Amino acid sequence: MMTERTFSIIKPDVVKRNLIGAILTRFEQNGFKIIASKMVRLTREQAEGFYAEHQGKEFFVPLVEYMMSSPIVVSVLEKENAVKDYRTLIGTTNPETAAEGTIRKDFALSQRENSVHGSDSIESANREIAYFFTNSEIFER
């Protein structure tokens, strides 16, 4: 097995409820190393750029507004099978259908306020990591 990296966003609903530590703890309890992490406040340009693939969809504007509503925590996580394992850990987009014990089942407020974002492929992870982090901000552990 090869060690992979994935990208995570702890979204505004978690930050506003002061649950950042609970989410980061879940990452570590599930074998992920946090090799980069920072809190950022997205500008409209950053939010629209990050979610550009959804431009024109009905949920795009509300999603951008939501992601700008509070600071977020962006992180790079590392472990074997990081992308797949992270997707399993966070659960489905809709918390009502997410499996018991997943982050979204336990923390999400709604399908939009679903607590976390996770890359859906290694290619997406690499692109999303580069969107928020320079190589000098990522640390081997």
UniProtKB/Swiss-Prot annotation:
SUPFAM superfamilies: Nucleoside diphosphate kinase, NDK. GO terms for molecular function: ATP binding; metal ion binding; nucleoside diphosphate kinase activity. The keyword Nucleus does not apply. One of its GO terms (cellular component) is cytoplasm. It is an enzyme of class 2 (transferase). Keywords: ATP-binding, Cytoplasm, Kinase, Magnesium, Metal-binding, Nucleotide metabolism, Nucleotide-binding, Phosphoprotein, Transferase. Its EC number is 2.7.4.6. Its cofactor is Mg(2+). It catalyses: a 2'-deoxyribonucleoside 5'-diphosphate + ATP = a 2'-deoxyribonucleoside 5'-triphosphate + ADP; a ribonucleoside 5'-diphosphate + ATP = a ribonucleoside 5'-triphosphate + ADP. It is found in: Cytoplasm. NCBIfam families: PRK00668.1. Belongs to the NDK family. Homotetramer. This is Nucleoside diphosphate kinase. It comes from Haemophilus influenzae (strain ATCC 51907 / DSM 11121 / KW20 / Rd). The gene is ndk.
